[in-house]
């Protein structure tokens, strides 16, 4: 019984560095209706880079 229009869906954040590294988190659709962009640590290249929401 998956909730298709859940208020807090699970999303994947994918590294923009092209390493393929991902973070999995939840977001609130009411507060952040646009795609999420966060600066997080990518251990494959040992740097902080932007991670973008992947749908």
Curated annotation (Swiss-Prot):
One of its GO terms (molecular function) is structural constituent of ribosome. This is Large ribosomal subunit protein bL33. SUPFAM superfamilies: Zn-binding ribosomal proteins. The gene is rpmG. Keywords: Ribonucleoprotein, Ribosomal protein. It comes from Paenarthrobacter aurescens (strain TC1). GO terms for cellular component: cytosolic large ribosomal subunit. The keyword Ribosomal protein applies. The keyword Ribosomal protein applies. PANTHER family: 54S RIBOSOMAL PROTEIN L39, MITOCHONDRIAL, LARGE RIBOSOMAL SUBUNIT PROTEIN BL33M. Gene3D superfamilies: Ribosomal protein L33. It comes from the Bacteria. InterPro entries: Ribosomal_bL33 (IPR001705), Ribosomal_bL33_CS (IPR018264), Ribosomal_bL33_sf (IPR038584), Ribosomal_zn-bd (IPR011332). One of its GO terms (biological process) is translation. Belongs to the bacterial ribosomal protein bL33 family.
């Amino acid at each position: 019984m998956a909730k298709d229009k859940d208020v807090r869906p699970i999303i994947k954040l994918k590294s923009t560095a092209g390493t393929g590294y991902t973070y999995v988190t939840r977001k609130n659709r009411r507060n952040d209706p646009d795609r999420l962009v966060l600066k997080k640590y990518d251990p494959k290249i040992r740097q902080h880079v932007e991670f973008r929401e992947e749908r």
